[in-house]
């Protein structure tokens, strides 16, 4: 039995999808434990780009896919992704936790209306209904996948929820209410398609563990978006840390290797503190070259220099024992590269991330400056062949954070990968 976990160390969009896709060729099960279709995974195979928002990235390699209890599921989006796989002749076996909560049309509308009401104080959500769905989960009023298996229960819960949500939509937001029969009709069609996959996924995973199967746990988004430990309130609505994997029925003690994905620079989507943000031509150059646009919303991502405080925090919270560095190839032909090693505020040096967003908005980054490299490194397949400037950048990160960079990704394609630790080739 071997269980591996892949976790984003920044604000998401680190390149987890490519790494997971590569590793999944030897995996029996790939498990997603958090988030919904607010997360996007981009994978390039044979020059064809696949973008998934709900399905785990390992789906293209034939691994059995599990959407765990911590995932919130928009059935319409899931069906669309499954149809895309079928269209491309990709076979997959999917299991949906009967404990997973279901995103409803009123969740999406409330997400949109709430963002509009906040005005300049908006968080920058994807408006996919994620937050309102998790709110119903915490409030213990949400509709779960298991409820879809008994139409009478689903009808009753839909009626109760819709009455409440329509009152909010009409009286607080002065917006047109939803029609019960319209939603019921639409979701009955979804149920007919998806009900075969809804099951007790903890039992499936327990059987897989007991029979020695190889399991890959896939985190969505990143540590700095965690609802508890991220830059609150500019965070997602779920736990993104490895501790959330317990919700899948897998004890953390059983996870053999935990690899954190680090992008060679920083990016984030939406509002919130971003200490190392690069405004101007260099940031624009990195964004365009790296195609840094949200795979879910297509919004341009904000670009910044690599911030080691976020990486150290992620390593500590997730007990990461390996790192994968992605998109180093995007940084060629930049004269000076910077890595943030600390923050400064009113004469005080911070070697950790302050909790207060008000402080974070005003700290100044303390940088270590590196000479850039001009060479196009995308076709390099051995670490020794990298420019010395690129190796200095990599090895400085390793020394500062105390964890080996075991994998280097130098492009979106599977083959553009350098392994510095054979463990990840031989899983």
Swiss-Prot record:
Its EC number is 6.3.4.4. The active site is at 13 (proton acceptor), 41 (proton donor). It is an enzyme of class 6 (ligase). Pathway: Purine metabolism; AMP biosynthesis via de novo pathway; AMP from IMP: step 1/2. GTP binds at residues 12-18, 40-42, 301, 327-329, 409-411. It is found in: Cytoplasm. Binds 1 Mg(2+) ion per subunit. The keyword Glycoprotein does not apply. Mg(2+) binds at residues 13, 40. It comes from the Bacteria. Pfam families: Adenylsucc_synt. GO terms for molecular function: adenylosuccinate synthase activity; GTP binding; magnesium ion binding. GO terms for biological process: 'de novo' AMP biosynthetic process; IMP metabolic process. IMP binds at residues 13-16, 38-41, 126, 140, 221, 236, 299. Keywords: Cytoplasm, GTP-binding, Ligase, Magnesium, Metal-binding, Nucleotide-binding, Purine biosynthesis. PROSITE patterns: ADENYLOSUCCIN_SYN_1 (PS01266), ADENYLOSUCCIN_SYN_2 (PS00513). GO terms for cellular component: cytoplasm. It catalyses: IMP + L-aspartate + GTP = N(6)-(1,2-dicarboxyethyl)-AMP + GDP + phosphate + 2 H(+). Plays an important role in the de novo pathway of purine nucleotide biosynthesis. Catalyzes the first committed step in the biosynthesis of AMP from IMP. Belongs to the adenylosuccinate synthetase family. NCBIfam families: PRK01117.1, purA. Homodimer. This is Adenylosuccinate synthetase. It comes from Borrelia turicatae (strain 91E135). The lineage of its organism: Bacteria, Pseudomonadati, Spirochaetota, Spirochaetia, Spirochaetales. The gene is purA.
């Amino acid at each position: 039995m071997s269980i591996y976990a892949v976790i984003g160390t920044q604000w998401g969009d680190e390149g987890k999808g490519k790494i997971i896709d590569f590793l999944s060729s030897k995996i029996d099960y790939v498990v997603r434990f958090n988030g919904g279709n607010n997360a996007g995974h981009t994978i390039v195979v044979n020059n064809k780009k696949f973008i998934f928002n709900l399905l785990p990235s390992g789906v293209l390699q034939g691994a059995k896919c599990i959407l765990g209890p911590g995932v919130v599921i928009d059935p319409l989006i899931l069906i669309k992704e499954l149809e895309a796989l079928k269209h491309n002749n990709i076979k997959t076996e999917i299991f949906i936790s009967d404990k997973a909560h279901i995103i409803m049309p009123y969740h999406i509308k409330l997400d949109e209306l709430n963002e509009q009401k906040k005005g300049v104080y908006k968080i920058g959500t994807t408006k996919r209904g994620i937050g309102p769905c998790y709110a119903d989960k915490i409030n213990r009023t949400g509709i779960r996948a298991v409820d879809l298996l008994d139409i009478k229960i689903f009808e009753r819960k839909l009626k109760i929820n819709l009455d409440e949500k329509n009152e909010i939509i009409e009286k607080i937001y002065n917006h047109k209410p939803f029609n019960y029969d319209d939603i019921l009709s639409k979701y009955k069609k979804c149920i007919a398609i998806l009900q075969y996959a809804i099951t007790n996924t903890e039992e499936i995973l327990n059987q897989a563990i007991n029979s020695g199967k190889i399991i890959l746990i896939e985190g969505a988004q990143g540590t700095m978006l965690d609802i508890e430990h991220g830059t609150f309130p500019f965070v997602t609505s779920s736990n993104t840390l490895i501790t959330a994997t317990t919700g899948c029925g897998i004890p953390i003690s059983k996870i053999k290797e935990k690899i954190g994905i680090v992008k060679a620079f920083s990016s984030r989507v939406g509002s919130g503190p971003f200490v190392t943000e690069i405004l101007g031509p260099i940031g624009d150059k990195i964004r365009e070259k790296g195609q840094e646009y949200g795979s879910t919303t297509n919004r341009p991502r904000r670009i910044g220099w690599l911030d080691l405080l976020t990486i150290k925090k992620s390593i500590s919270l997730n007990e990461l024992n390996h790192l994968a560095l992605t998109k180093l190839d995007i940084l060629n032909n930049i004269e000076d590269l910077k890595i943030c090693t600390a923050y400064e505020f009113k004469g005080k040096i911070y070697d950790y991330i302050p909790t207060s967003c008000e402080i974070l908005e005003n700290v100044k980054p303390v940088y270590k400056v590196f000479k850039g490299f001009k060479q196009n490194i995308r076709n390099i397949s051995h670490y020794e062949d990298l420019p010395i400037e690129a190796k200095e950048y990599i090895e400085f990160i390793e020394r500062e954070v105390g964890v080996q960079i075991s994998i280097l990704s130098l492009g979106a394609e599977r083959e553009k990968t350098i392994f510095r630790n054979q463990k990840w080739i031989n899983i």
